[in-house]
């Protein structure tokens, strides 16, 4: 297998080109309704409802599963969104664009006119768990939810709830038995005399990358 290869393009198409199988996939898809990348027809994240968004990602990860070894795993980072519907103004979820030239695009992703059934103004949608349960229904084994705790979260001006400072990382496996090296990720004990099992809350600072879509997620180089 070729290593250190970066492929550009739509993952829904590029995944079909793979000849070799991978043992692990680590990814963080575009979150629902939080950003406009300027490609209205093809981008993921501006669907008309959370359910449409989840269904699209289920299809993506179905292709991912086809490219995993039988003992392979999927590590999926996913953040949540709030429902924001104003009568007469529609549903405004997309607040910013990666590209300044796309921030004022007069497209459906900037303001949706439909009111979503089952959601109230200011509701936390619960997108990570909607996706997790949908992937489980599609055949994935949902093995664990990991909390990514952010010591330096994005400031929020909201005054009627706590500042959001965590996201989810889900561990999925293709089959019941899969590769997981528990010893490789053990952490030092408090006294420094031994090692202990890694726990399911990971404290990782976010780091800005001005040339990388202003986005970051925890990686194997951020193990703490």
Where are these regions (language model features)?
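Conserved SAM-binding strand-loop segment of SAM-dependent methyltransferases
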Residues: 4-10
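SAM-dependent methyltransferase catalytic-core segment centered on the flexible catalytic loop
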Residues: 11, 21-122
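Short loop/turn elements that flank and shape the SAM/SAH-binding pocket of Class I
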Residues: 12-16
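Feature marks short, surface-exposed loop/turn motifs that line or immediately flank catalytic pockets
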Residues: 31-35, 82-84, 149-152, 176, ...
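Short, solvent-exposed loop/turn and secondary-structure capping segments
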Residues: 35-38, 86-89, 147, 182-184, ...
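A SAM-dependent methyltransferase catalytic signature shared across enzymes that methylate proteins
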Residues: 131-144
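Flexible, glycine-/basic-rich loop-and-beta segments that form/coincide
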Residues: 143, 149-201
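Single conserved hydrophobic/aromatic residue that forms the stacking wall/gate
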Residues: 215-224
């Amino acid at each position: 297998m070729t290593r250190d290869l970066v492929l550009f393009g739509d993952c829904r198409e590029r995944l079909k080109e793979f000849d070799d199988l991978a043992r692990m996939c680590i990814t963080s898809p575009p979150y629902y309704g939080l950003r406009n990348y300027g490609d209205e027809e093809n981008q993921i994240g501006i669907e008309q409802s959370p359910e449409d968004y989840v269904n699209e990602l289920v299809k993506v990860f179905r292709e991912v599963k086809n490219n995993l070894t039988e003992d392979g795993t999927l590590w999926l980072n996913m953040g949540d969104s709030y429902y924001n519907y104003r009568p007469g103004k529609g549903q405004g979820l997309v607040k910013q664009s990666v590209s300044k030239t796309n921030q004022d695009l007069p497209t459906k992703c900037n303001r949706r006119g439909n009111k979503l059934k089952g959601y109230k103004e200011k509701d936390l949608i619960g997108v990570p768990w909607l996706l997790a349960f949908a992937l489980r229904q599609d055949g994935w084994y949902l093995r664990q939810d990991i909390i990514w705790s952010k010591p330096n979260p994005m400031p929020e001006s909201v005054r009627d709830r706590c500042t959001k400072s965590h996201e989810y990382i889900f561990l999925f496996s293709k089959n019941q038995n899969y590769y997981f090296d528990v010893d490789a990720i053990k952490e030092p004990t408090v006294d420094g005399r031994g090692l202990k099992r890694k726990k399911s809350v990971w404290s990782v600072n976010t780091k800005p990358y001005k040339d990388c879509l202003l986005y970051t997620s925890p990686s194997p180089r951020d193990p703490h």
